């Protein structure tokens, strides 16, 4: 039995306003909530712990090239399906779906422009496209980036962000390891520097080919760099791995890297290296 009925609500609430999608990001490392504008101002790194979020090739281009002015090249290349590969879906259907949903056309973008007034060629990988895996198109793009650097008499920077070779292309993907490594010798013959920047993650056939062949090997902080993943290694050798194994700091300590560079310092460091090594 209801004894009384409130005539008017005692507490007034405003209608809930939905938060704009993507306005707040959560740091995967420390859990801090970061506003999108704060992230952009800090080059997509956490202001609390320094964690580096994965970013697209275009964000690296904007960071590196003067006035965000650059020219992209070889963007018309598309993946083929030499094996007619099918797992849960056809390989070409998978590629088509990713292109439709994301607008990305491959796991690598090439561009050239000026960094502090000096010409620079950049080939940047994108983990958001099939894990940044290297198939025949990615290998060809990196090879053509080498050719462009030679044509422009400019240094080459390759930014790795990949899980390894693209297994859906079988031996064609593995061939790219030898192809990219061999093409880089042309840069060496022309005495043009090759800078390799490894970001999280740089794994598998990428590490085993061009990523470790830089005249200067650089990494972002705490990037995972290796061939097989730590879990696979641990399960194979039946031993615990050293703390920080396969992280950038561990590799720097053991001589596999030359520099670890915070993203906000990346352009400054690349320009400094160009000044020292470029013709």
Swiss-Prot record:
Q: Which GO terms describe its cellular component?
A: acetyl-CoA carboxylase complex
Cofactor binding comment, as recorded: Binds 1 zinc ion per subunit.
Q: Which residues form the CoA carboxyltransferase N-terminal domain?
A: 23-279
Q: What are the start-end ranges of the zinc fingers (C4-type)?
A: 27-49
Alphabetized InterPro entries for the sequence: AcCoA_carboxyl_beta (IPR034733), Acetyl_CoA_COase_Trfase_b_su (IPR000438), ClpP/crotonase-like_dom_sf (IPR029045), COA_CT_N (IPR011762), Znf-ACC (IPR041010)
Major location (coarse) = cytoplasm
Query: Hey, which pathway is this one from?
Result: Lipid metabolism; malonyl-CoA biosynthesis; malonyl-CoA from acetyl-CoA: step 1/1
Q: Which UniProt key words apply to this protein? A: ATP-binding, Cytoplasm, Fatty acid biosynthesis, Fatty acid metabolism, Lipid biosynthesis, Lipid metabolism, Metal-binding, Nucleotide-binding, Transferase, Zinc, Zinc-finger
What GO molecular functions are on record for this protein?
Answer: acetyl-CoA carboxylase activity; ATP binding; carboxyl- or carbamoyltransferase activity; zinc ion binding
Q: What catalytic activity is recorded?
A: N(6)-carboxybiotinyl-L-lysyl-[protein] + acetyl-CoA = N(6)-biotinyl-L-lysyl-[protein] + malonyl-CoA
Q: Which residues bind Zn(2+)?
A: 27, 30, 46, 49
Q: Could you describe the subunit structure of this protein?
A: Acetyl-CoA carboxylase is a heterohexamer composed of biotin carboxyl carrier protein (AccB), biotin carboxylase (AccC) and two subunits each of ACCase subunit alpha (AccA) and ACCase subunit beta (AccD).
Family to which the UniProt record says this protein belongs: Belongs to the AccD/PCCB family.
What this protein is reported to do is described as: Component of the acetyl coenzyme A carboxylase (ACC) complex. Biotin carboxylase (BC) catalyzes the carboxylation of biotin on its carrier protein (BCCP) and then the CO(2) group is transferred by the transcarboxylase to acetyl-CoA to form malonyl-CoA.
Its protein name is Acetyl-coenzyme A carboxylase carboxyl transferase subunit beta
- Organism (species): Chlorobium phaeobacteroides (strain DSM 266 / SMG 266 / 2430)
């Amino acid at each position: 039995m209801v004894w009384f009925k409130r005539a008017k609500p005692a507490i007034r609430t405003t209608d809930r306003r939905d938060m704009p999608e993507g306005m707040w990001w959560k740091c995967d490392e420390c859990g801090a909530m970061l506003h999108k504008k704060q992230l952009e101002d800090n080059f997509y790194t956490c202001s609390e712990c320094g964690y580096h979020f994965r970013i697209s090739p275009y964000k690296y281009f904007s960071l590196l090239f003067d006035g965000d002015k650059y020219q992209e090249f070889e963007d018309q290349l598309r993946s083929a399906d030499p094996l007619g590969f099918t797992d849960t879906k056809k390989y070409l259907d998978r590629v088509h779906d990713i292109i439709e949903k994301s607008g990305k056309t491959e796991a690598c973008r090439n561009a050239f422009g000026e960094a502090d007034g000096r010409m620079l060629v950049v080939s940047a990988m994108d983990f958001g496209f099939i894990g940044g895996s290297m198939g025949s198109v990615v290998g060809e793009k990196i090879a053509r980036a080498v050719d462009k650097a030679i044509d422009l008499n400019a240094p080459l920077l390759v930014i790795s962000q990949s899980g390894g070779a693209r297994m859906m292309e079988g031996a064609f993907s593995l061939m790219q390891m030898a192809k990219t490594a061999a093409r880089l010798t042309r840069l060496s013959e022309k005495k043009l520097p090759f800078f390799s920047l490894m970001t999280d993650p740089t794994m598998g056939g990428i590490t085993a080919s061009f990523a470790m062949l830089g005249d200067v090997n650089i990494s972002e902080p705490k990037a995972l760099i290796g061939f097989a993943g730590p879990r696979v290694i641990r399960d194979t050798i039946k031993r615990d791995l050293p703390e920080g194994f396969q992280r950038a700091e561990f590799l720097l300590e053991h001589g596999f890297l030359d520099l670890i560079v915070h993203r906000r310092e990346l352009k400054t460091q690349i320009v400094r290296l160009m000044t020292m090594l470029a013709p």
